[in-house]
Regions:
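Hydrophobic transmembrane helix bundles of membrane-integrated enzymes that assemble
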Residues: 54, 76, 132-156, 176-177, ...
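Active-site acidic catalytic loop and adjacent metal/ATP-binding pocket
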Residues: 150-211
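ATP-binding glycine-rich loop module of kinase domains
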Residues: 3-41, 48, 56, 64-65, ...
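Conserved kinase catalytic-core helix
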Residues: 42, 47, 72-160, 166-167, ...
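Extended charged low-complexity segments that act as oligomerization/scaffolding linkers
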Residues: 20, 33, 51-52, 58-67, ...
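Phosphate/pyrophosphate-binding loops and the adjoining catalytic core of nucleotide-dependent enzymes
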Residues: 2-13, 17-18, 92-108, 228-236, ...
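Active-site activation/catalytic loop segments of kinase-like enzymes and analogous catalytic loops
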Residues: 191, 199-262, 278-293
Length: 316
């Protein structure tokens, strides 16, 4: 069976060099350099060893081959007891909070304004470039929904200096590996972070591991509360029942619901997690152009999260 570490995105290629090494390559040299530098600098995160960075028309680096599964595969298929999975979530959240307690260098405060691109600016730019009319209104399960512009405007995510941290930057379940010798009593030695962002999200793409710690937690929420991995696995689907009307079918299991409740109990029931998730789903729609069904489901799911947010945090 192909090791699940080897799943790659369309802009990367991953090949097996030997039983202990894989090679990740891309035409995006800056991305390869940024990832490699993150691995070199961020020893606080357990990650595979990397070496042999090569920069050229096709840039690459070699990485220790971790035999195991992604957290996404474990979650989708419920491969470990739910109590153990919740313990893993606690470990990751504690890692994020521990990193936040490490003060970033004073000169890195300059990155704060650039990080704002992560949210409303990126969402608006991607959707308009893809051809969305942000003034269109939608229906979800027969419920009237405001326009995407109104939704985006209500999903404010502010960043101040206390939010700056040394982050992973793309902390989704598919970028977290659990090796085959997993021991819930010793998670640190069996959990590995891969595919960090390593650069600013705006057009400058300046290489840095500084980011908004809330974004890392929001990416976890995107998998747990937002059901991203279940959508990718075709376990949650939406039907388009009109030009801008959807029916969303959500049949999450008790296992998933326990993990959701545990996340909220640990990370807090905060509106900002919903705001980040909504931005993530909307901004990802153009990136899934190869699968219109996933695009419909992601849009419908963003509308679902908006309704949940309104019901949870509506001003009394």
């Amino acid at each position: 069976m192909l090791n699940l570490m080897l799943a790659s995105r369309y802009f990367n290629s991953i090949i097996i060099v030997n039983d202990s090494t894989i090679r990740k390559a891309s035409k995006d040299s800056k991305k390869m350099i940024a990832e490699y530098r993150w691995f070199q600098e961020r020893d606080e995160y357990n990650h595979p060893n990397v070496y042999n960075l090569q920069v050229g028309d096709i840039s690459s680096y070699d990485m220790e081959y971790i035999h195991g599964r992604t957290l996404s595969d474990i979650y989708v298929n419920e491969l470990i007891p739910v109590e153990d999975f919740c313990t893993i979530i606690d470990f990751i959240l504690n890692k994020i909070i521990t990193m936040r307690k490490q003060s970033v260098k004073y000169e890195d405060y300059r990155f704060r304004e650039s990080l704002n691109f992560l949210y409303a600016e990126k969402t608006t730019e991607r959707l308009t470039n893809y051809g969305f009319n942000l003034n269109w209104k939608y229906k979800l399960n027969e419920i009237e929904i405001p326009s995407l512009k109104e939704i985006i405007d209500t999903c404010e995510v502010s960043i101040d200096n206390t939010d700056l941290s040394y982050v992973h930057g793309d902390l989704c379940f598919s970028n977290i590996l659990i090796d085959d010798n997993f021991d819930v009593n010793n998670i640190e030695d069996h959990l590995y972070f891969i595919d960090p962002r390593g650069m600013l999200p705006n057009k400058s793409k300046e290489i840095t591991s500084v980011g908004d710690y809330k974004y890392d937690i929001g990416k976890l929420a995107h998998s747990i509360i937002g059901n991203y991995d279940l959508i990718k696995a075709n376990l949650i689907k939406a039907d388009k029942v009109g030009e801008r009307s959807f029916t969303l079918y959500d049949e999450t299991t008790q296992y998933k619901n326990i993990v959701k409740e545990h996340f909220f109990a640990t990370a807090g029931h905060k509106e900002v997690w919903y705001n980040i998730m909504i931005h993530l789903f909307l901004s990802m729609i153009p990136l899934h152009d190869d699968n219109p069904k996933h695009q419909d489901t992601m849009l419908a799911n963003a509308l679902r999260l908006y309704l949940e947010k309104v019901n949870l945090f509506r001003k009394k």
